[in-house]
Amino acid sequence: NSIMSGKKLDDIPGITYNKKGKWIQTGPSERITHLGEIQSPYLIGLFDDLKQEEYSVNAIIETDRGCPYKCTFCDWGGTTFSKIKKFDLDRVFGEIEWAGKNKIEMLNSSNANFGIFKERDSLIVDKIIETKHKYGYPKLFETSWAKNSNQDVLDLAIRLEKNGLLRKFGISVQSTEPEVLKNIKRSNMKINDFDDILDRAKQNNISVMVETIVGLPGETF
């Protein structure tokens, strides 16, 4: 809209563009205050034509936006100003229902910390399971699980696994060295809690993916 209205690229916040071989980054864009202002592309019919085609389709939804953490080597918290905002549950449920009706193979939630809202995210998992039983879809659900995942978060993964929906359960540690974690402004769960999570996941046949970053400040010289 800005370009069509004749606005110069320099005056459009929140973009990066190439100007005569030099990359230009404009200032930060104003954050959307009310997520209800954003229409769902699924619910307004932008992707309805997909159901006419014999494609294997994945879909991405977002149930909340933002991250309360400010880990140095993660762009999520810094770019979203840390405050988490939630999409209306009716919208989220509508998108999950759309995914089921339209035979979406894998539903991906692009949240930064799925499971951080215990009761709300439990309701969302209920809806995903209910939708699969109703339509046979989605086949799988994937997301970025809450940092410092606890047993409550693992409970969500176990329910998904029991209904054949879980692809993997991811735990991000970045590093286990205390000095490195201090350098990158990050804290992890206690190692005993981490072991308990792994043991219980194994007991429930859940594949666990552990995310680390190699060569963080203070780790290698």
What is the predicted function of each stretch?
Residues 23-26, 38, 181-184:
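Short clusters of hydrophobic/aromatic residues that line enzyme substrate/ligand-binding pockets
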Residues 29-48:
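A short, charged helix-loop
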Residues 42-204, 214-216:
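Radical SAM [4Fe-4S] cluster-binding motif and immediate context
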